[in-house]
From Swiss-Prot:
Phenotypic effect of disruption: Fails to produce aflavarin.
Organism expressing this protein natively: Aspergillus flavus (strain ATCC 200026 / FGSC A1120 / IAM 13836 / NRRL 3357 / JCM 12722 / SRRC 167)
Residues engaged in binding heme: 410
Swiss-Prot/TrEMBL cofactor(s): heme
Gene: afvE
Protein name as catalogued: Cytochrome P450 monooxygenase afvE
EC number, as in UniProt: 1.-.-.-
Pathway(s) of this molecule: Secondary metabolite biosynthesis
GO annotations of cellular component type: membrane
Length: 471
């Protein structure tokens, strides 16, 4: 249906329609088409085709191109450069992740009193859960991206958050009009203009620091022998390795590469703050609605802290399988084709430019794969006999698709789940939290193929009593 005709069309229940399509098509091994937020269409592939598409190389199946089209990102930033993904792989090692963990812990420690309240305040404080957690995650993400001093740069964080918040609404605004009018909407709409202005302001703030880090990298040989100090350092080193930047001097294209690195930092911030915040928001909703989880999770992390010498390290998380299971259950509960492809398993040919998807949420709610799938079970993945979370929290499979699967699986899933667990459990250790409503509102809502947290839920928080924690 055209955008013009859709103005008069009635709304439909996304979750209900996707569930019906899953039963009618996916469960019988057939693909089906669905309309996306950008007025394009995607092909939802059944699970019996997984073995074929999960091994397709990046030049045939590109998540970055799909995201660029899906969210209209190609209109304002370069999303197709693979340097950010390669930089994440470069940072996916114990030494670097441990360093990032210290940044997360320190940033969370500094930000919590500013966002939620000081430890000395004993009274309950009313706050919006969605915006509180989103602000906290944005602060922590900035520390991992640029270093500890930038986690307190409120001006930069607020500007980049405003840009992030406007991405999907501006996409919906522009694509709600007929194609012939979209260039005018992009140029004249107050929403789109404000988003572009925030993007420009953010790049202006980032540019001097990126240039400074490049100069440091060029002046110090072996500067990353101990690993990158931040994701920006990892990006710069990856750009050196690829030849995008010269290690010795400016070849005359530094300004162009710096602008690209700034866009990649902005993309990193969006990916490490917004989806992570959504996971934590859902986890907080569960805790408020199921208080029986609070004490076991606190006790587990208290014991884990003792095993790691009293400091919150990366190893602390390794001793907290219940926490890992709880977060993985939160992830459960709550691609674009580059070249012509033929999937033999379902006899389907895909043209270049086709966006493909997997029926993730419906698979996660399928009783054939999960017992009592519509009931939240925080210990679903906890193996009590072994004291482990099985499978591991970041392990993907055809029936656990939160981070996609195969070659196109999210390369930052290890870092994302690390940030999620760290922020959530530190929040739970430091604060009591309860629902500020008489009864729990809906956790979230379906928005096309995505399931988003309810932004109107209010919580009440106060500092925990020290003797309750035992740490």
């Amino acid at each position: 249906m055209s955008a013009c005709l859709r103005w008069w069309s009635r709304k439909f229940d996304c979750e209900k329609e996707y569930a019906e399509a899953y039963k009618q098509y996916s469960k019988t091994g057939k693909p089906y088409a669905t309309r996306l937020k950008n007025n394009d269409h995607g092909i939802v592939l059944p699970l019996n085709s997984t073995k074929e598409w999960r091994t397709l190389p990046h030049d045939q199946l590109s998540f970055l191109h799909a995201l660029s089209e899906f969210a209209d990102l190609y209109m304002h930033i370069n999303m197709t450069d693979r340097t950010p993904l390669q930089a994440v792989h470069y940072c996916n090692n114990t030494k670097t992740l441990s360093r990032f963990n210290r940044l997360m812990v320190d940033a969370t420690d500094r930000a919590l009193p500013l966002i939620v309240g000081k430890d000395t305040e004993s009274e309950w404080k009313r706050a919006n859960a969605f915006h509180t957690i989103l602000s906290l995650c944005s602060t922590v993400a900035m520390s991992v991206l640029l270093g500890p001093e930038f986690s307190m740069d409120t001006s930069l964080i607020q500007t980049i958050m405003m840009y992030n918040t406007a991405i999907m609404p501006s996409c919906a605004k522009r694509t709600s009009y007929p194609r012939i009018l979209r260039p005018f909407v992009w140029r004249l709409s107050p929403l789109c203009r404000a988003m572009k202005s925030d993007l420009t302001k953010t790049k202006i703030k980032l540019t001097p620091e990126i240039k400074h880090r490049i100069d440091i990298a060029r002046s110090k040989k072996g500067w990353l022998e101990e690993g990158p100090m931040s994701l920006l350092d990892g990006l710069i080193e990856t750009a050196f390795e690829k030849g995008c930047l010269s290690r010795s001097s400016d070849r005359g294209d530094d300004d162009q590469q710096v602008a690209l690195l700034a866009e990649e930092i902005i993309f990193y911030h969006f990916e490490l703050s917004t989806p992570v915040a959504f996971f934590i928001i859902f986890a907080v909703y569960v805790i408020m609605n199921n208080k029986e989880y609070s004490t076991p999770l606190r006790e587990e992390i208290s014991e884990a802290l003792k095993l790691s010498g009293g400091s919150f390290t990366l190893d602390t998380l390794n001793h907290a399988p219940k926490l890992a299971s709880f977060v993985k259950e939160t992830c459960r509960f709550f691609r674009r084709v580059m070249k012509p492809i033929h999937l033999e398993s379902i006899n389907l040919s895909l043209k270049p430019g086709t966006i493909i998807m997997a029926p993730g949420r419906d698979v996660h709610l399928d009783p054939d794969y999960y017992d009592n799938p519509t009931t939240f079970n925080g210990y679903r993945f906890y193996d009590a006999s072994r004291g482990t979370c099985t499978p591991h929290i970041s392990t993907t499979s055809p029936t656990f698709l939160t981070f996609s699967h195969g070659i196109s699986a999210c390369p930052a899933r290890v870092l994302a789940t690390q940030i999620t667990r760290t922020i959530f459990i530190m929040f739970l250790l430091k604060f009591d939290v309860e629902l500020a409503h008489e009864e729990m509102p809906a956790y979230g809502f379906a928005n096309g193929p995505a399931y988003l947290p309810n932004p109107s839920v209010m919580m009440r928080v106060r500092p925990c009593q020290k003797d309750v924690l035992g740490v």
